[in-house]
Amino acid sequence: MALFHVRMDVAIPRDLDPKVRDETIAKEKAYSQELQRSGKWPEIWRIVGQYSNISIFDVESADELHEILWNLPLFPYMNIEIMPLTKHGSDVK
């Protein structure tokens, strides 16, 4: 498995049809919760005061992460930063 730290900043256009906005957000929530339940998205944290999150993904590869992110319904409205992670030599676990 490969771990990734992912920051997602969302910027939905103000002129987006409200119905489309609501449907997209509902689809995003369902998709992300499915990934959380599967263990592929074990951590998600809101950044206070922003429409942003910091997430940890536990996936097979960078290719799998790419597919997951591209399938996010809000992907077209996101700026995403990805950092691959590895175990730290001083970790006591």
Swiss-Prot record:
EC class: isomerase
Catalytic activity, EC: 5.3.3.4
Metabolic or biological pathway: Aromatic compound metabolism; beta-ketoadipate pathway; 5-oxo-4,5-dihydro-2-furylacetate from catechol: step 3/3
SUPFAM superfamilies xref list: Dimeric alpha+beta barrel
UniProt keyword annotation of Ion transport present: no
A GO biological-process term: beta-ketoadipate pathway
A Pfam family hit: MIase
UniProt-listed InterPro entries: Dimeric_a/b-barrel, MLI_dom, Muconolactone_d_Isoase
GO molecular function term, any single one: muconolactone delta-isomerase activity
Superkingdom as given in the UniProt entry: Bacteria
Keywords: Aromatic hydrocarbons catabolism, Isomerase
Catalytic activity: (S)-muconolactone = (4,5-dihydro-5-oxofuran-2-yl)-acetate
Quaternary structure and interacting proteins, as annotated: Homodecamer.
Cited NCBIfam families: muco_delta
Family in the record: Belongs to the muconolactone Delta-isomerase family.
Name of the protein in question: Muconolactone Delta-isomerase
